């Protein structure tokens, strides 16, 4: 999970990409919500915002804009 705009967002489904990068862990590196992690990239596929129903990434991004280069915690 991560926090964004003071809301907890659970990652329900994701794909790990074994790829080298130079980003800080937690950095959003694409507009498709790919997140840099220690030794690769996490491509989020399904998530659930606090007190909301689960959504696939396309549905989520229609209503929530998490900008590239945002560092998630």
From Swiss-Prot:
One of its GO terms (molecular function) is methionyl-tRNA formyltransferase activity. It catalyses: L-methionyl-tRNA(fMet) + (6R)-10-formyltetrahydrofolate = N-formyl-L-methionyl-tRNA(fMet) + (6S)-5,6,7,8-tetrahydrofolate + H(+). It comes from the Bacteria. Pfam families: Formyl_trans_C. Its EC number is 2.1.2.9. Belongs to the Fmt family. This is Methionyl-tRNA formyltransferase. The lineage of its organism: Bacteria, Pseudomonadati, Pseudomonadota, Alphaproteobacteria, Rickettsiales. The gene is fmt.
